[in-house]
Amino acid sequence: MSVASAVLRVETWLLATWHVKVPPMWLEACVNWIQEENNNATLSQAQINKQVLEQWLLTDLRDLEHPLLPDDILELPKGELNGFYALQINSLVDVSQPAYSQIQKLRGKNTTNDLVSAETQSTPKPWEVRPSRMLMLQLTDGVTHIQGMEYQSIPALHSGLPPGTKILVRGCILFRLGVLLLKPENVKVLGGEVDGLSEENAQEKVLARLIGELDPTVPVIPNNSIHNVPKVSGGLDAVLGPSDEELLASLDESEESAANNDVAMERSCFSTGTSSNTTPTNPSGFEPGCNISSRPKEKPPNQPTHFTDGEFDDFSLEEALLLEETVQKEQMETKASQPLTLKENTGKCMEIFSHKPSSLNHTALIHKQGNSNFDEKTSEQMIHEDKFFDCASTRNHHKRFSAHDFTNDSKISEVDDAAQQTLSSSNVHCLRNKILNRKLDLSEKSSQISKENGHPFQACSSRSFENNTYLSIGMDLHSPPFIYLSVLMARKPKEVTTVTVKAFIVTLTGNLSSSGGFWGVTAKVSDGTAYLDVDFIDEILTSMIGYSVPEMKQLRKDPLKYKTFLEGLQKCQRDLIDLCCLMTISYDPSSCKGVVLELQDVGMEHVENLKKRLNK
């Protein structure tokens, strides 16, 4: 008997006996495999039919990708389904009973109120209808996913059916909004199961997802409010900082508050980002005794990553350091976008232009004076498993931190005092008047720049852009002491250009990584007029951390010395949080990105240069 004739007979038998339709390619591969498994021995047609059916029952229909249901069944609000359809049960749950009580029974926990003597609810009367079971099934033909509801009690179904069980849906079936209303005469259980689904959609896991429990195989991320994080005083805990769970838990809160502030405040800068998720399509292939092709399982988020000494040539510090994600609501106030315009902004002006540096030389960070008291919660796994903090963060130079963040309430008052000592009020008023007297209609210009330079530059609101552009009239790209990103955006340089801007880190767009023996991290910076994606070079990060990548590898061999490396990471975290300085950036118009080559503290010479530029 030839393979082609055997395949044709099996296809006819499956359709006539079981109303099962399968792809011809899969059927041919299955018959060939059966013959190979039997050493090409002569098998009767009945034996081939039986083994093909067994293989189909163990196959995940999603891998076959052979549509059976009507294409528009999910689009119609209601209708009737007629005919025979062999479908697969991905999961099922009894929706007539609370999911919590069901999962407690599965776990063998006693939920009866034995200690409660009072009558908690009225006893049902004998004539009252008792609640009956109602199963909700997640069904698929391999392409279309639809729900099936136990409209009437179906004895053939029960909650113990393994995920991947095949059923035959037949007859005239009503459906409403993508839900089949199943009756006993509409369902016939064919059997089978799918190994992958048996673990993924086990009854306990399905119920746990319904009540909001996290998968025990995935690290738990507590939903801690930034106001309710307990304080830890002294010791190593205060040095290592908050755990990666806290950083990730607070990420959504800080992003939510930032989004609300962007909508509410007209002068605040805005930025948008998009992310795309791609799902690989598994090719149809045949594997004996199981699914046609194994479906790849997604790696749970925040899975701990362990590194060996030889794995640091190119690694991502998955749990790693960098910026604190427990920043409270962003304070994008008018003061930050309108320097030198109001009397109360005197201190802010001088915080920008006359901040006292720890060194007048080119340095890799800004050292700020004052009491910096921080109380942080520590992840114990960081010591034993060499894990790091996640590095995503948002940062504004005037943000306020909660109790367990880095708090330094004396900074503003200290800088205000320094500002008042440096510039007299008359000079401030003089500068303010000169700025306000330069009238230029910039709304059209700002909108044009925003459209033409949408990425990676992202323009601020028109009023913020207008106020910041008062200082940039007649400014070239090398005008001392610094220029604005909006000016660089407007000039549209054709070649790689090196400029100096006074900016701060808004957020890190990548993890701290080590590649080829060099540190690297990507970030989004802003000077209040626009945003720019940049890379920080190894020299800057090495200066902040205190150790190069080769030195870090040596420190890992000694637990005591490795502790100092972790302290260096924490120091780098604090420095990046407070980072607001002059940045020398090499901007490449072809890639629309920049490279931060140097960080420099603001000195008095920069203030004098700024005065000269304003007096022109």
Curated annotation (Swiss-Prot):
This is RecQ-mediated genome instability protein 1. GO terms for biological process: DNA replication; double-strand break repair via homologous recombination; glucose homeostasis; multicellular organism growth; reduction of food intake in response to dietary excess; resolution of DNA recombination intermediates; response to dietary excess; response to glucose. Component of the RMI complex, containing at least TOP3A, RMI1 and RMI2. The RMI complex interacts with BLM. Directly interacts with RMI2 and TOP3A. May bind DHJ. Interacts (via N-terminal region) with BLM; the interaction is direct. PANTHER family: RECQ-MEDIATED GENOME INSTABILITY PROTEIN 1 (PTHR14790:SF15), RECQ-MEDIATED GENOME INSTABILITY PROTEIN 1 RMI1 (PTHR14790). It comes from the Eukaryota. GO terms for cellular component: nuclear body; nucleus; RecQ family helicase-topoisomerase III complex. One of its GO terms (molecular function) is nucleotide binding. The modification Phosphoserine is found at S225, S293. It comes from Mus musculus. Essential component of the RMI complex, a complex that plays an important role in the processing of homologous recombination intermediates to limit DNA crossover formation in cells. Promotes TOP3A binding to double Holliday junctions (DHJ) and hence stimulates TOP3A-mediated dissolution. Required for BLM phosphorylation during mitosis. Within the BLM complex, required for BLM and TOP3A stability. Residues 269-311 are annotated as: Disordered. InterPro entries: RMI1_C, RMI1_N, RMI1_N_C_sf, RMI1_N_N_sf, RMI1_OB. Residues 271-285 have a biased composition (Low complexity). Keywords: Acetylation, DNA replication, Isopeptide bond, Nucleus, Phosphoprotein, Ubl conjugation. The modification N-acetylmethionine is found at M1. There is a cross-link at K335, K387 (Glycyl lysine isopeptide (Lys-Gly) (interchain with G-Cter in SUMO2)). Belongs to the RMI1 family.
